[in-house]
């Protein structure tokens, strides 16, 4: 049986689910950019790409060389193709305007070019997260500057989302709103090949991911839930749990997609004015879309993440996602 490449899969989606051709082309361009980023990441010190730039992004985070390089790769790959009205990135304060010499399209691309980049120098898996939105018709004028408001849509309006993980293998996980597929990069073929079909997150789990060093700063519902997990078989949940924490959202979520679990990045008391650490538009929304399409759940503790109406491009949010039973349990604790 012949292997199904990403291109073939997308063509078949156009035939069977009426996936628009311009969306198919957009996903293929993003995938090509991810292959280029994967190559740069794999070279490491040999490519002179490790270390920091000595600059900060809009989040106040020190930019790694590969952060900036990955951002440029995604911008340059997508700006000319005619599929996009604009782009937004973790690494840029404002939306990226499609240069006037190129045609504009109907979609918006939002991305974290290199999630987990603090792990680059220690050779831990990192990745690229992306979300595709339709550009509202009122912002489609070819001559106008695209405003931030065009991007401020709830996660339910996403038409596609995915992430590439750069680890022992490079994989692309993708949803077009009808389930989640996993593609592995065949370096000899030069293509992403379908290797994981109809991915499903188990409803219950015996694993959880959270940064335990922040325990003293958590809100009461989170403390209660984690204490119950740690109590094991003798505790109220009646089974033993293992903790896993990689400190790379892509790597932690990828593990949950493949074998179940719950990922938690709660708000804490150190910065009470902030609703969380992770960014809604280009981290929480695409990952929540993927997790829900795989049968899991995602909330901020009180509300479904995909229902949140963004107030700004770099809005932060608390995140609890993964196996449905566990996410519903901790959401219930927040409601008490």
Curated annotation (Swiss-Prot):
Annotated TM spans: none
Annotated EC: 3.1.3.11
Binding site for Mg(2+) 2: 112, 115, 283
Chemical reaction(s) catalysed: beta-D-fructose 1,6-bisphosphate + H2O = beta-D-fructose 6-phosphate + phosphate
GO BP: fructose 1,6-bisphosphate metabolic process; fructose 6-phosphate metabolic process; fructose metabolic process; gluconeogenesis; sucrose biosynthetic process
Predominant subcellular localization, coarse grouping: cytoplasm
Name by which UniProt lists this protein: Fructose-1,6-bisphosphatase class 1
Gene of this entry: fbp
